[in-house]
């Protein structure tokens, strides 16, 4: 690794999976606006939509994630077309 190009300000940060409310603490340099208290210690909080605890690849369960209505938008544009 090259010297002087990697961040040095790693600190414990809580990542919260919003799809199943799992939380895990890891070291990161990410800036967070929210905080959370766990076991009497306050940590920066980063909310994520999907993590290894809810991703179908890791869980083995299939799940449709449609956060922006993309499937509905596609179906309204192309779903009613007849096959030739």
UniProtKB/Swiss-Prot annotation:
The keyword Ribosomal protein applies. It comes from Parabacteroides distasonis (strain ATCC 8503 / DSM 20701 / CIP 104284 / JCM 5825 / NCTC 11152). Pfam families: Ribosomal_L31. The gene is rpmE2. GO terms for biological process: translation. Keywords: Ribonucleoprotein, Ribosomal protein. This is Large ribosomal subunit protein bL31B. Disulfide bonds: none annotated. It comes from the Bacteria.
């Amino acid at each position: 690794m090259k010297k002087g190009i990697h961040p040095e300000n790693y600190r414990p940060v809580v990542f919260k999976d919003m799809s199943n409310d799992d939380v895990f603490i890891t070291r990161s340099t990410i800036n967070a606006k929210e905080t959370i208290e766990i076991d009497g210690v306050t940590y920066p909080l980063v909310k994520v939509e999907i993590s290894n605890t809810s991703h179908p690849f890791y869980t083995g369960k299939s799940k449709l994630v449609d956060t922006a209505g993309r499937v509905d938008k596609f179906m309204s544009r192309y779903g009613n077309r007849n096959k030739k």
